[in-house]
A protein has these predicted regions:
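Beta-strand-centric surfaces of beta-sandwich/beta-rich domains
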Residues: 26-395, 401
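Bacterial N-terminal signal peptides that target proteins for export
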Residues: 1-9
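C-terminal segment of classical bacterial N-terminal signal peptides
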Residues: 15-23
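Extracytoplasmic copper-binding redox domains, predominantly the cupredoxin/blue-copper superfamily
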Residues: 393-553
Length: 553
């Protein structure tokens, strides 16, 4: 993705975007390494089109720093020009995304409107290296280490941009800012190359590396679900279906010669609490690092208003050949289920021999002290991640208190079309028609079938809009955001994303446009539901309090 005609004007606009809110005195921010010949650059893709309601998992190509503009330092952008033979080290990587408004203005979109579900930079000749989710963690390698790459190198770019609205015709840039230290001749000795070992609890062979963290999956009843540790081996136990999602990519065995771990920071989704790194040698296991989710969100672990902790500058781990590092991730399932969850931990690894590195088993006290000290944030609160519309009182009626007035669920079920459920569906906006919110009635024990007319077989990916039917706790009628509604209905059901994705989106969707709920059994009960992808979409169904033929008020 290249666009050389865009230069200083765009870079200046990006620079003026609202910065992260300053951290409090209790939340120190990790500083970046510094070198006399280091230069900071801003980079961005060409414009990426955004379709109504999209949640596409896509692949593109990019360069080390396309559309490069110097921010500070002695260098110039020619090191990234086509045909450049320059080599250098990336010592800091700060990802983000901006929307291109019709007048050319660049704005960081709010997470409840349009957000960067994930983006992964795949290194030339290697694997996943830099990445971001909505929390936008910065990579800040410690002094003396960097990721070595050519200035004109080709990279892969896997990205998933989630449009939570029905508005199309939008465009964004994926952006990143890097600190670049040039290689010299003879080769410099003050920076050692570090590469990434990508740990992923639900990665390969899955293309879309997710699992479900549901209420009731915590085997000890503590409300915390540790994946993959708490996935049962008994097929009759709740959560056994997640077993097939456990990936061998969650662990790595150190090759001959040993290794030094120099940096790590985890990625998880709302509901996630922490990502843990441990090492095993000769049957003994030692904890190395916990990447904690620091939620600014007043409601707790329910939104993207979060920053992740990374390892501190003095964190160095010396490993021997045959040692195995592994990761796990923990979710809070005490009050909601979290579908399509992630647990990823990119670990930067260098050659053995750093005298400051500590061996987990020979220097166990020092390693334990580093673990107990905990991590450090790479940035403060991001204004775009404040979930300000969630849980707003929209003055909408409680579906449980509305009479159905003869409305029934048709034998064909409920249709989804034009970003709405019908009958019984509504948009969570002020002033919505009360008559359309009235819940349709079914007989006790009925399973209701939904058909997504927004994503029928044969439609292209960009024509489709994928929706879910996910149970929520009544009244489920407050303002939409990341942290509301939550998947916490009295009957646990979730359809997955109904539609027909292809290529990298194959596993994002169910491969069907139809979903049928479990039986709805409780007489007189009004069941509410929403779409996880477009949470302004709501609906309800009422079970008749007496035989269907006698009618309902």
């Amino acid at each position: 993705m290249r666009q050389r005609c865009v230069g200083g004007l765009i870079a200046a606009a990006i620079a003026l975007l609202a910065p992260a809110a300053p951290a409090s005195a209790d939340d120190p921010i990790l500083g970046a390494a510094s070198y006399p010949d280091m230069t900071t650059y801003r980079c961005h893709t060409d414009a990426i089109p955004i379709y109504p309601g999209q949640n596409l998992n896509l692949l593109a190509t990019t360069k080390t720093c396309p559309n490069a503009v110097k921010v500070s330092g002695p260098g110039d952008a020619s090191v990234f020009a086509p045909g450049s033979t320059a080599q250098g080290y990336i010592t800091r990587f700060a990802p983000s995304m901006v929307e291109i408004k019709p007048d050319g203005q660049l704005v960081t979109p709010s997470v409840w409107d349009l957000h960067l579900h994930h983006v992964v930079w795949v290194a030339p000749g290697g694997g996943p290296t830099f990445a971001s989710g909505e929390e936008k963690t910065h990579v800040k390698l410690p002094q003396g280490y960097g990721f070595k790459v050519a200035g004109d190198a080709n990279w892969g770019l896997n990205y998933m941009i989630h449009n939570l609205t029905a508005v199309g015709g939008r465009q964004v840039y994926i952006t990143w800012e890097i600190d670049w230290v040039p290689e010299t001749a003879p080769a410099r000795t003050d920076i050692k190359p570090a590469n990434v070992r990508w740990l992923d609890v639900a990665g390969f062979p899955q293309i879309y590396p997710v699992f479900d963290a549901e209420r009731g999956f915590d085997t000890n009843g503590d409300g915390k679900y540790v994946f993959p540790d708490e996935v049962p081996t008994d097929p009759s136990q709740p959560g056994y279906e997640e077993r097939r999602k456990i990936s061998s990519a969650r662990q790595w065995t150190v090759p001959a010669g040993g290794a030094t771990l120099v940096f790590a920071a985890g990625h998880l989704h709302p509901g996630g609490l922490h990502v843990d790194l441990q090492v095993t040698r000769g049957g003994q296991t030692m904890q190395l690092f916990r990447s904690d989710a620091h939620y600014y969100e007043p409601a707790g672990a329910v939104s993207w208003d979060v920053s992740m902790t990374a390892t501190r500058p003095d964190w160095r781990i010396s490993l021997q050949a045959g040692d195995t590092i592994s990761e796990s991730v923990t979710y809070d399932v005490s009050r909601a289920s979290w579908y399509e969850s992630m647990g990823i931990l990119p670990v930067f690894v260098a050659a053995a021999g750093d005298p400051a590195a500590k061996d987990p088993f020979n220097d166990d006290a020092a390693v334990r002290a580093m673990y107990d000290e905990g991590g450090i944030l790479t940035h403060g609160r991001l204004p775009e991640n404040v979930d300000k519309k969630a849980r707003k009182d929209l003055k909408l009626p409680d579906p449980r208190k509305l009479k159905s007035k003869g409305r029934r669920v048709p034998k064909s079920g409920i249709d989804i079309g034009g970003f709405g459920y019908s009958p019984g569906g509504y948009s969570a906006v002020r002033g919505y028609s009360v008559n359309r919110i009235r819940p349709p009635v079914v007989r006790p024990g009925t399973s209701v079938t939904f058909t997504n007319l927004d994503a029928l077989f044969g439609m292209s990916q960009t024509e489709q809009t994928w929706h879910t039917i996910t149970s929520c706790s009544a009244p489920c009628n407050l303002g939409s955001g990341i942290g509301y509604p939550l998947a916490r209905g009295p009957i646990k059901f979730d359809s997955g994303q109904l539609g027909y994705g292809n290529a990298l989106s194959t596993e994002v969707t169910t491969g069907s446009d139809v979903y049928t709920t479990p039986p709805l059994t409780k007489r007189g009960k009004t069941y509410t539901y929403f779409c996880r992808i477009h949470p302004f979409m709501r609906g309800s169904i009422r079970v008749a309090p007496r035989p269907h033929g006698h009618g309902h008020a």
